[in-house]
């Protein structure tokens, strides 16, 4: 029997199979190590095939295998996705591959997840932000995922019907029991998250460590209040709709889809708008500057360059799309490229930012009330890993 040398145990790990396996710390308040792109499991299942396209169980297992083989360990699902098939199939996959300990699983509670079987109106307490809904959802998610813990549990949507103390006390209880490790929240106003995290900090409870919301070069509302809030509380931001509901595609890509009998999803409008077409062209220009044809990789790279602790969710049903999206991790966008992409759309931060200005730590420019007093210089905030100027001379791409 051959032993292992001590120096080998303390030596560095080998290079990953792809940049997906160059892991990152989730957030300043959550030290778990995760892949920089999260696999979205909305399409894992066949119950919603009419709207999202068909994916049988074998294809789902192959997609999960391909993600893991590329170094991916970060999967996003929810209690009701695909009428509960998403969690169930992920659980079966982890059990058959005996890889639960290698995966970081995020799931969600809040919306009614049992109406598909029980009918509308009957499962009233299977939905909501309250303790009973939370209890049943976590009980069922643990069973479907075939696990004893959930790495990240999100509140899927704030519904204004449960008090912040009830919500945060109930979530903290699950953390104390070891059934949930980290807390997240989606689709919720910044003031609610701020109030919830402040309550948690004051009461010695577990705070939210990650926020999930919509963000892409044409939908930048998250930058107004949610992104500064996340930075203040040490939260990561996981991003859905990063590819504009699949509308960020070149003319060639759209033509190939139509030739294959696969157009854009009707649930998302069916066709590109003029603005989506213009953004796709702009993404193509930046892609060409980086020697790639992938507009989706550039759309993801845009988010990875915008702020630290940002993790885009990549969905889809095809392995080739997965590999295409992984290209984003090797791209570094400059400030000029970011501004070029943002020039296509129209984002107005509005009041009070149009009066008070924005944080000089981001811009290096004094706000009006500071500038009137004296010339000032400012320490700049840390940039994202995917921001070009933050990696000059670096040969790593993690």
Swiss-Prot record:
Domain of life: Eukaryota
Pathway noted in the entry: Secondary metabolite biosynthesis; terpenoid biosynthesis
EC number: 1.1.1.-
Catalytic machinery residues: 81 (proton donor)
Record's keyword annotation contains Cytoplasm: no
Family to which this protein belongs: Belongs to the aldo/keto reductase family. Aldo/keto reductase 2 subfamily.
Quaternary structure note: Homodimer.
Identification of the protein by name: Aldo-keto reductase ausK
Organism: Penicillium brasilianum
């Amino acid at each position: 029997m051959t032993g292992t040398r001590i120096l080998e145990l303390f030596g560095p790990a080998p290079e990953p199979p792809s940049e997906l396996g160059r892991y990152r710390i989730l957030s300043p308040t959550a030290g778990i190590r995760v892949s920089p792109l999260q696999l979205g499991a909305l399409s894992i299942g066949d119950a919603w095939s009419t709207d999202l396209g068909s994916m049988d169980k074998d294809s789902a297992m192959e997609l999960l295998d391909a993600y893991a083989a590329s170094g991916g360990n970060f999967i996003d699902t929810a209690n009701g996705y695909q009428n509960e098939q998403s969690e169930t199939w992920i659980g079966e996959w982890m059990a058959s591959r005996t890889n639960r300990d290698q995966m970081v699983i995020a799931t969600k509670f809040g919306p009614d997840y049992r109406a598909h079987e029980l009918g509308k109106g009957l499962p009233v307490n299977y939905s909501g932000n309250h303790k009973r809904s939370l209890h049943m959802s976590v009980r069922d998610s643990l069973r479907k995922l075939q696990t004893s813990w959930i790495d990240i549990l999100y509140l899927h949507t704030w519904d204004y019907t449960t008090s912040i103390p009830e919500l945060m006390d109930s979530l903290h209880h699950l953390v104390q029991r070891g059934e949930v490790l980290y807390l997240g929240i989606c689709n919720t106003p910044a003031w609610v998250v701020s109030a919830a995290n402040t309550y948690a900090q004051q009461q010695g409870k577990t705070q939210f460590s990650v926020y999930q919301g919509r963000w892409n070069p044409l939908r930048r509302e998250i930058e107004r209040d949610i992104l500064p809030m996340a930075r203040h509380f040490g939260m990561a931001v996981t991003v859905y709709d990063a590819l504009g509901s699949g509308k960020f595609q070149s003319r060639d890509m759209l033509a190939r889809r139509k030739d294959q009998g696969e157009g854009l999803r009707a649930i998302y409008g069916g066709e590109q708008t003029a603005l989506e077409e213009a953004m796709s062209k702009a993404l193509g220009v930046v892609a060409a500057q980086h020697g790639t044809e992938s507009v989706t990789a550039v759309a993801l790279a845009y988010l990875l360059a915008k702020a630290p602790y940002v993790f885009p969710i990549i969905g889809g049903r095809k392995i080739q799309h997965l590999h295409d999206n992984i290209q984003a991790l090797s791209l570094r966008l400059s400030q000029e490229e970011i501004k070029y992409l943002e020039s296509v759309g129209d984002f107005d931060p509005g009041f009070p930012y149009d009066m008070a200005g924005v944080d000089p730590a981001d811009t290096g420019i004094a706000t009006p009330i500071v500038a009137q007093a004296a010339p000032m210089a400012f320490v700049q905030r840390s940039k994202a890993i995917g921001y070009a100027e933050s990696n000059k001379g670096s040969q790593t791409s993690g």
